[in-house]
Amino acid sequence: MNKLIENCLFLKDKDRFNILRTKASDFRNTFIGETIVRDSIFDVIQNYVKSKEHEIKLLKFPIDDTELWAFTCLKDGIIFVTINTALPLNNQIFAAAHELYHIYKYIEDSQEEYIEKGSILTRKDFDEEDVSEEDREANAFAALILAPKEQIEKQIKITGREFTDSGLYDLIHFMDYFAMPYKGMVLKLFECGRYTEEQADILLQSESRKTLEEAYIHDCGTRWLEPTFENNLASLKALV
């Protein structure tokens, strides 16, 4: 079994996964509704924090190190979230949803250590097998927020999509629809029972480049595969 599958929260701790699924569903019902999140995740985070009467600064700028995806910290009562915009947009979106979990824990569970000490998301925390329990939960929460099972099943019913380890276009369609990274979408469809363990294992052994090339060929989802290089650091001037 691929280590990414073996170590995902869905298999590693189903009780904890089910608790997170309920929390994510409640969060969506209160702060998102039926909307497909995609790049509105940045507004979702800010609106959520402000609704809880906390202050937040969401900073976006390109960092010349694509191993670094995002980080969050607390300074003088202000929550600072930084997103690396040199990453493909779908990675930025997932990184933001991951950081949302740390913020959620801080606000809802009074777990100040989650961001007072700083939360840093790197590529290995998403892309590799061995991650901390905290980041494993944050990855699961992010996927539950961005692509809940109910919306996946609804989209499958509408489109009649099928999923095999050899036909990648249906997978790419869902990556596009939910603005999810490749491996995250494979794991999500496995979690929803749309891929068997064997199929997911084959797909996770494939080079991501193969998927990206096919996406370009079909002109599907290319928007999410490009960096934005957005820079809003000027918004910090008021704090200096």
Predicted regions, residues:
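Active-site hotspot residues in diverse enzymes, especially metal/ion-binding acidic/histidine motifs
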Residues: 1-240
